[in-house]
UniProtKB/Swiss-Prot annotation:
Phosphorylated during oocyte maturation and dephosphorylated following egg activation. Dephosphorylation is calcium dependent and correlates with the increase in the activity of EDEN-dependent deadenylation. This is CUGBP Elav-like family member 1. It is found in: Nucleus; Cytoplasm. Belongs to the CELF/BRUNOL family. One of its GO terms (cellular component) is ribonucleoprotein complex. The lineage of its organism: Eukaryota, Metazoa, Chordata, Craniata, Vertebrata. RNA-binding protein implicated in the regulation of several post-transcriptional events. May be involved in pre-mRNA alternative splicing, mRNA translation activation and stability. Mediates the rapid and sequence-specific cytoplasmic deadenylation of EDEN-containing maternal mRNAs following fertilization. Binds to AU-rich sequences (AREs) of jun mRNA. Binds to the embryonic deadenylation element (EDEN) motif localized in the 3'-UTR of maternal mRNAs. Binds to RNA containing several repeats of the consensus sequence 5'-UGU-3'. Pfam families: RRM_1.
């Protein structure tokens, strides 16, 4: 059978043009026709060939059109992912050609909302038949068989569906409905998957914020010992008033610095040291930094009780008030202030006492180590101000931080951009750059990026919290970026 003797000159109107892959390159139209005609009469076979070769060689795929739609579907059911042709390693791939998608059901199917619950399928068909031939109309019903007040209508062409949308959307309010009728294209499977992914991302980000709010209060115990020591040195050596000595020596510049760093802020920083030390059961913290009627006393009393368990951490509820005050202190201690303090200390080094100089250095170093913990304790409060500071230059930048402060992040969602990456990693410290890499050919994300902090402690905190964090169906891979001396950055 050659398919042309028993049929008219053209295939049926509803016939399907199929794409067929995993075909031997040595096969011609003759061998392919013998394979497919056992499922029905074949109208046309077109082998795709590489015209750059002489003679042109088969690319191992073809287009085939049967006279009937039934024959095409039977061939697909029997061959797709089922039969391996001679000399091939994978089964035949057979699916409708891209040109057939122009009239796919999803492009002709309408969702109709705010429908009267008194309507049935015939009423819906009568309402929309004026716009063209209807292939299917269906009312959505609950388990009890009652209408849910919405329906699907499928036309035979997309143009008919578009006319129905234009004429019917919000054109009337049906009986028993609070809003006008809604007529739009029904969600495709891709649309549903994207909505599900978005919902999952939102839920996971909320869970991350909740975990940061409470879990990371106990995580203060991971604060590096050197930062605790620096904070304790600042508070216990009588240096709460030492910055006042900078005023007559530094003039207006020193005045600006000390106005952003008052005794209460230093006291709050000391309170954080006490809280972290208490979480680590460091006996000296409570005795060295006790101050009555202050956030400090709350924090020390919450974690340094003699009868507390050796593995206990700071009570989150008891410490929340103190950490709120701490957030106010860190808001005044931005990166620019600390940089100015460091410059002031260096410029007036010969005039300042050793005690004051060491205090400034200690405070500057300690701040960089505790910044992420203030963010973890109060993420919503902290992120609003931090995003305005960091977002101006960090998102999209490829500026690198110091050694050990640069991260490589893999398995990012396809839709994530620079700003999303920045916001995800801000709670752990001061981000100097956040960059998602884009494929120049497709302009789509490569699903990996880099984040750089201004200190290694923040990078380690981000790795501990975010490595393995699940987004959608994948888990983030977060690790230190290799140094420039290595052949690969990751």
């Amino acid at each position: 059978m050659n398919g042309t003797m028993d049929h008219p000159d053209h295939p049926d109107p509803d016939s399907i043009k199929m794409f067929v892959g995993q075909v031997p390159r040595s096969w011609s139209e003759k061998e392919l026709r013998e394979l497919f005609e056992q499922y029905g009469a074949v109208y046309e076979i077109n082998v795709l060939r590489d015209r750059s070769q002489n003679p042109p060689q088969s690319k191992g795929c073809c287009f085939i059109t049967f006279y009937t739609r039934k024959a095409a579907l039977e061939a697909q059911n029997a061959l797709h992912n089922m039969k391996v042709l001679p000399g091939m390693h994978h089964p035949i791939q057979m699916k409708p050609a891209d040109s057939e998608k122009n009239n796919a059901v999803e492009d002709r199917k309408l969702f109709v909302g705010m429908v009267s619950k008194k309507c049935n399928e015939n009423d819906i068909r009568a309402m929309f038949s004026q716009f063209g031939q209807i292939e299917e109309s269906r009312i959505l019903r609950g388990p009890d068989g009652m209408s849910r007040g919405c329906a699907f209508v499928t036309f035979t062409t997309r143009s008919m569906a578009q006319m129905a949308i234009k004429a019917m959307h919000q054109a009337q309010t049906m009986e028993g409905c609070s809003s006008p009728i809604v007529v739009k294209f029904a969600d495709t499977q891709k649309d549903k998957e994207q909505k599900r992914m978005t919902q999952q991302l939102q839920q996971q980000m909320q869970q991350l914020n909740a975990a940061s709010m409470w879990g990371n209060l106990a995580g203060l115990s991971s604060l590096a010992p050197q930062y605790l020591a620096l904070l304790q040195q600042t508070a216990s050596s009588g240096n709460l008033n030492s910055l006042s000595g900078l005023h007559p020596m530094g003039g207006e510049y020193a005045t600006g610095m000390t106005s952003g760093l008052n005794a209460m802020q230093l006291q709050n920083l000391a309170a954080l040291a006490a809280a972290a030390s208490a979480a680590q059961n460091t006996p000296s913290a409570g005795s060295a930094l006790t101050t009555s009627s202050s956030p400090l006393s709350i924090l020390t009393s919450s974690g340094s009780s003699p009868s507390s368990n050796n593995n206990s951490a700071v009570n989150p509820m008891a410490s929340l008030g103190a950490l709120q005050t701490l957030a106010g202190a860190t808001a005044g201690l931005n990166v620019g202030s600390l940089a100015g303090m460091a410059a002031l200390n260096g410029g007036l080094g010969s005039s300042l006492s050793n005690g004051t100089g060491s205090t400034m250095e200690a405070l500057s170093q300690a701040y960089s180590g505790i910044q992420q913990y203030a963010a973890a304790a109060l993420p919503s409060l902290y992120n609003q101000s931090l995003l305005s500071q960091q977002g101006l230059g960090a998102a999209g930048s490829q500026k690198e931080g110091p050694e050990g402060a640069n991260l490589f992040i893999y398995h990012l969602p396809q839709e994530f951009g620079d700003q999303d990456l920045l916001q995800m990693f801000m709670p752990f410290g001061n981000v100097v750059s956040a960059k998602v890499f884009i494929d120049k050919q497709t302009n789509l994300s490569k699903c990996f990026g880099f984040v750089s902090y201004d200190n290694p402690v923040s990078a380690q905190a981000a790795i501990q919290s975010m490595n393995g964090f699940q987004i959608g169906m994948k888990r983030l891979k977060v690790q230190l970026k290799r140094s420039k001396n290595d052949s690969k950055p990751y």
